[in-house]
Curated annotation (Swiss-Prot):
GO biological process: negative regulation of DNA-templated transcription
GO MF annotation list: DNA binding
UniProt source species: Bacillus cereus (strain ATCC 10987 / NRS 248)
UniProt xrefs under Pfam families: HrcA
Database matches in NCBIfam families: hrcA
Top-level taxonomy: Bacteria, Bacillati, Bacillota, Bacilli, Bacillales
Official protein name in the record: Heat-inducible transcription repressor HrcA
């Protein structure tokens, strides 16, 4: 069990190192207003913290840096919530106030903004639709040649896309088709829609719409939606701006992993509910042993539908990132309900 003095010194070392990326020595600590102990006391406590495995020496400096054990203790026991600047809160809320109907756009823009706000790499795993059930479908004409097809699921997820309307299909045919779809398909799992449409619905449509072949083309375009999760990245190259990763050889395997994307898909799709923090070698990939990955799940109602994560150095601004993720997951959840 650490003493109050050791807790204060450990927290100050980690806070300072996160901000400066420079090893922290006793002289640096002695200049801090919150540290009122003598230099000798500070050195003794630092020696004890090193012996306990919370901090460690570097080859190029007499100062100390946090170890993985130190970061883990910091995250679990010392971290305090950080209040985000009001302008950032407004920026994030304004994004979701735009009523973005497409889950894909919500995920893409979330990844981009998070990467800009943190200068780390942001990763968003979009919602998986295959287990959702169709609630209703709408086809809203924009002009004579185009319309917006809107699919709403039982979880409140909204998927929209622009489709082409052949000249041979009139508005009355569109209306009949939508009525038939909603009558026959409401409550059907999304993964079964394609099979049900082309085995059952097409036969029904033949007796109601004038231009059957063109109506089938509209159907095919309307229900071509991705059922598996899609992964979106923001700031893939942001790691290169971190002092820890200026050595390109050191970061090569990480950049390859980020560029490949598939491994992150496997990592994120099995995340537990809530905020999860993986530090250094706690991560499953050796390419991430100098990184921390903070992830949070977002949901619609009781159902977890996606994951949003930030990848950065172990010297990460943990409190700020966690606060951002908490705000984003709330906003994404609300955005997908619109």
């Amino acid at each position: 069990m650490l003493t109050e003095r050791q807790l204060l010194i450990l927290q100050t070392i980690i806070d300072d190192f996160i901000g400066s990326a420079q090893p922290v020595g006793s002289r640096t600590l002695a200049k801090k207003d919150e540290i009122t102990f003598s230099s000798a006391t500070i050195r003794n406590e630092m020696a004890d913290l090193e012996e306990l495995g919370f901090i460690e020496k570097t080859h190029s400096s007499s100062g100390r840096v946090p170890s993985e054990k130190g970061y883990r203790f910091y995250v679990d026991h010392l971290l305090a919530p950080q209040n985000l600047p009001n302008d950032e809160i407004v920026q994030i809320k304004d994004l979701f106030a735009e009523r973005i109907f497409e889950a894909e756009k919500i995920a893409q823009q979330s990844a981009q903004i998070l990467s800009e706000l943190t200068n780390y790499t942001a990763i968003v795993l979009g919602p998986k639709l295959s287990t959702n059930k169709l609630k209703n479908v709408q086809i809203v004409p924009l002009d004579r040649q185009t319309a917006v097809a809107i699919i709403v699921t039982d979880t409140g997820h909204v998927q929209s896309k622009t489709i082409t309307v052949p000249e041979s299909v009139d508005l009355s045919d569109l209306e009949k088709m939508v009525n038939i779809l909603n009558e026959k398909l409401s409550g059907v799992p999304m993964s079964e829609l394609h099979n049900k449409i082309f085995k059952e619905i097409v036969t029904v449509l033949r007796g109601y719409v004038h231009n059957y072949d063109s109506a089938i083309k509209i159907l095919d375009g309307t229900f071509q939606v991705p059922l598996s999760e899609k992964i979106y990245f923001g700031g893939k190259a942001n790691m290169l701006s971190q002092p820890e990763f200026h050595d390109i050889q050191k970061v090569r395997s990480l950049l390859t992993m980020i560029d490949n994307e598939a491994e992150f898909y496997d990592i994120l799709r099995h995340k537990q509910v809530g905020i999860q923090v993986k530090i250094g070698r706690e991560n499953s990939s050796t390419a991430m042993e100098d990184c921390s990955l903070i992830s949070a799940t977002y949901s619609i109602g009781e159902e977890q539908v996606g994951t949003i994560a930030i990848l950065g150095p172990t010297r990460m601004q943990y409190s700020r990132v966690i606060s951002l993720l908490q705000l984003f997951t709330r906003q994404i959840t609300d955005g997908l309900k619109k």
